[in-house]
Structure formats: C-alpha cells, structure tokens
Amino acid sequence: MRIYIAVFFFFLTEFSFSQNNSSWFTQLMIRELVYELSDDDYEGRQTGEEGGQKAGDYIFNYFTKKFKDFKNVDIYTQEFEFSVSKNPHINSDNGVKKLAKNIMCYIDNKKEETIVIGAHYDHLGHGHFGSLYTGEQSLIHNGADDNASGVALGMALMDVLYDSNKMYNYLFIAFDGEEMGLYGSSFFCKNPTIDLSDIRFMLNFDMVGRLNSNNDLAINGVGTSSKWIDLINQVNIDNNFKLKLSESGIGPSDHSSFYLQDIPALHFFTGQHEDYHKPSDDRNKVNYEGILDILFFVENIIYASNSINDFDFKETKNDSQKTPKFSVTLGVMPDYLFSGKGMRIDGVSKGKTGDKYGILKGDIVIKMGSVDVSDMMSYMKGLSQFNKGDETIVKILREGKEINISLIFQ
C-alpha cells in the first residue's frame, strides 16, 4: 500500500507550486509533508543525527523541485555547529561538535518588507533527551504534531502566498535545534541572511496539528505590536476560531528569538496533549483539515495587514519572570487552551501523584491548599507552597461537582 501511495504522491508533486492552489491540493500537500516527515525513516529527526540531516535534505529538495522554474525564489541552507555532551541531558561547550542546518526558501517580490514564516523541523530522535515517555524500551519519537504539522503548514503557506499576495517578500525558515534550546532561530537572528530591519513580522507555527472540535487556537505574542489584537479579531469574524490570546513575546518556541530582536512575532498553537514528547505523537492523530483552516486564517491575516502602514513593535511583559518556582507537581498535563476559571487537566501521567489519588483527565483544579486556583499562574503558585512529602487538600471540579482530594506529594 505504501508503494502505491508513494507513486501517487510522486506524480502529484511533479506539478509546480502555483499551478493549483485549491483547498484540495493544499490539504493534500499538507498531508504528504506530515506523513513523510513523521515517518520512521527519519528516526525522530534529532538535530545533528542522520535522521535530522535527512529531514533537512528532504525539505530542501522538496522546495528545490517545486520552485525550480521560478527565478525569484532562492532555496538555501544555513549550517551551524553545536556541542553535545556525553551526558544526553546536559548541553556542554566541551562536548562533541556536531552540525545542524536551517533550511530557507526566499520569495523575492522586490518589496521593501519581508514576512518571515518559521517552524522547527527537529524532534527528539529516540527520546534520549526531552522525552516524557516512561517505558523501558527506546522508541522513535516521530513528532507528527511537534512539529511536522508546523513545517507542513509553513511550506504550504509559501505555495499559497506565491500567487495570492505579492505585497511582501517571504522567507520561510525550517529551524533546526529548537528542541535543544532554540538553536536554529537564535543562530539566524545573530547571522541573518536578510536585513532584520526589513522584517515586517514573524509568524511561527509550532504544534498546529491537533485543532479540536471547539476550534480552540492559541496565539502567543499578540502584545508584540499594537496592531495584532484588532487585526486578528477582525479576521476571525469569518473564521470562527475560539482564540486564546497571550501577549508575551517570550515562550518556548522560535518566535522568541525574533521578539528579542524587536520584531513583532506570533506563535500559533493548537494545544498540548497526552502524546506530547512521546512516541505516540503519530501522523494518524493529526487534524489535517484543521491545519488547512489555520493556513487560510493566517493568509487572511497577512492580506488584511496590507492596509497597515506602520507595523510597530512593542515590548511585552515576560510572563516567565513572574512564574513561581516549585519543587513538586501533580504529574498532570494542563490544558493551555482552557479559558475558564481554574486549571483544567488534559492528561494524567501514570504512577504520578495525581494518578495515585484519583485525579482524572477533564478535572478542573480550583483550589490547592489555601491558594485559590483561577489560572495557570495561580496553580503554579499553589504548587510552590509545598515540598515532597507534604500533605494537602486539592479541590477539583468534576462534571459540575466540587470534590476534595487529600494527597501527599511524591
């Protein structure tokens, strides 16, 4: 079956990018890219390893083939070195030197301003670092949502923009080394291939493959320009996303590197899930129609921004500086898209404190000890009051009923 699919996609992708921009073609392109990049052949796309290098080559060759007849398109790579410690959990300048590479596609429309579109293509390899998988066997972490989904969206968006909007130049960057610490985006911003002052704004796609039935979509960085909120809300009138907007320009993804260069930057995100950083983040769980919906939403944002002459930059409050420090956890996955009162739980890790005392997915934490929990920040404040071995009562809301759970932190 896989042979037939591969042959079909081979003939399909012989068409040039601009020949067919229909929704059908674009969604098929997205599916093809996600399926390829999240295949076992790439062994989890770890930075500096054979699978990661192979993934970068695939993206480069894909763009090269598609844009081979377009004189205003340039495809190139940006290599950089990084150090790997013998201990996989520690990055060290004294470790083994390895090569990584960003993959670039630049559409030159001879305009003064450039819009940067970014997505990291690296992932966790076999899970020797950064994995939340607790099994004993080493397994490939394919990272279909994180972040084959973002790469596919960005590449397909370049296809659409080539014909639909020539008001700007466009630079797509598939970043390497994000999982190890934003290596690729940081290197680009320190060694830019275009003048940073010419960048109008940056759009980052990281984990956009799990749009749920409520159409919940998080957009981080809306405070990085005074123009973002009105622009996004106006465009969303015709898109019906349930938006969760966050102002901070700092976050655990590549938009942060651009924000630190005084560039307005957004991060699009469909939410965390139980498969995050686990081998189970596979392509059969991706919402391909959802990625397409986000793509056209972003295309409309870019188009609507045409009427804004001065896209200003604003410094934002760094939410991470206000984050309380804590030494214990419940062993649960927060629902970062939840906009109600409390902290809703999106997943529970087996064997951890929450699981041991009967906390379930879907429960909403509303109080921890003496601390009322209204959001993620107050939840972390509650955790900061305790140490390992401390006993407390956690009040949750389950199916509309308040329940007190007495527990001891492990």
Label the model's feature ranges.
Residues 356-376:
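Conserved PDZ fold ligand-binding element
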Residues 24-54, 65-74, 201, 205-210, ...:
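N-terminal capping segment at the start of a domain
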Residues 317-361:
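PDZ/PDZ-like groove recognition
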Residues 1-24:
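Bacterial Sec-dependent N-terminal signal peptides
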Residues 381-410:
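PDZ-domain C-terminal substructure recognizer with occasional recognition of PDZ-binding tails
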Residues 45-107:
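A non-catalytic alpha/beta surface segment that caps or lines the substrate-entry region
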Residues 74-77, 208-316:
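Active-site-adjacent substrate-binding region
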Residues 88, 93, 97-99, 125, ...:
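Acidic/histidine-rich catalytic neighborhood of metal-dependent amide-processing enzymes
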